[in-house]
Regions:
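Hydrophobic, aromatic-enriched alpha-helical segments typical of multi-pass transmembrane helices
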Residues: 2-240
Length: 240
């Protein structure tokens, strides 16, 4: 059983943050919806593997080309910016040092993803490949596309995944010591992001990562509810 009360570890009286909480709540809700859309797209239209396959996909359907190169994942990370800011504001009084570190890791992870995503470049190369007059020109564009895909699946992407997961684990640990968010929210955050790092388990890593998305989706739903409560100046104190 739970009851609503004015929390003592956040500035509910400071209405300056209410808009941020509302924006973060909307962002988290949109992200939860996008996760479902991404799963459907992944099942119905598995992403290509080679540069030439991406070129053909862009030529057939540009939108599917961008979606295959994680357009919605980029949008997720844009929406993560207000979410991280709101989490910092809500939890900074519980442990400001941890929250500064977590926010910094999260923003570096977002920047790494933005820097590594090759969607626009691959779209341009696809158009040039289609317009090429000779086989030599087409080979040149194919040779340019493969390194882009390799780089995207390389250091920057993994840095984004690792830093983002660590950031949300740290934030979730801080949640455990706060009455601002439920314990269930904290545990979902820890579980989903620890499992995400299971990507590096040989052979089954990708399946562990995909499994983690279920718990991440639940986490987004729970933080959505909490942000909307905070936007009203309320927090949930869970009786355990």
């Amino acid at each position: 059983m739970s009851q609503l009360k004015q929390p003592d570890d956040i500035d509910v009286a400071d209405t300056r943050w209410h808009l941020l909480y509302r924006v973060a709540g909307i962002s988290a809700l949109i992200t939860a919806a996008l996760i479902l859309v991404q799963m459907i797209i992944f099942i119905l239209w598995p992403p290509p593997i080679t540069a030439i396959d991406y070129f053909k996909l862009f030529q057939d359907n540009s939108l599917l080309g961008f979606l295959a190169l994680d357009l919605l994942y980029v949008v997720d990370n844009v929406l993560l910016v207000p979410i991280l800011l709101a989490l910092y504001v809500a939890l900074r009084r519980t442990n400001v040092s941890f929250m500064i570190v977590a926010a910094a890791l999260g923003f570096v992870g977002i920047a790494a993803l933005f820097a590594s995503n090759p969607a626009v470049s691959m779209h341009v190369l696809s158009a040039r490949y289609a317009a090429a007059a000779t086989e030599a020109q087409r080979s040149l564009y194919m040779a340019a596309g493969e390194p882009m895909l390799a780089l995207y699946a390389g250091t920057a992407y993994h840095l984004s995944l690792i830093l983002g997961s660590i950031a949300l684990v740290v934030i979730s640990v801080v949640m455990l010591r706060s009455r601002t968010f439920t314990k269930a929210t904290a545990y979902m955050g820890i579980l989903s992001n620890v499992l995400a790092l299971g990507l590096y388990v040989p052979r089954i890593g990708i399946y562990i990562l995909l499994f983690s998305i279920i718990f991440l989706w639940v986490w987004y739903i729970l933080v959505t509810r909490s942000f909307f409560r905070l936007a009203q100046g309320l927090s949930q104190d869970v009786m355990q």
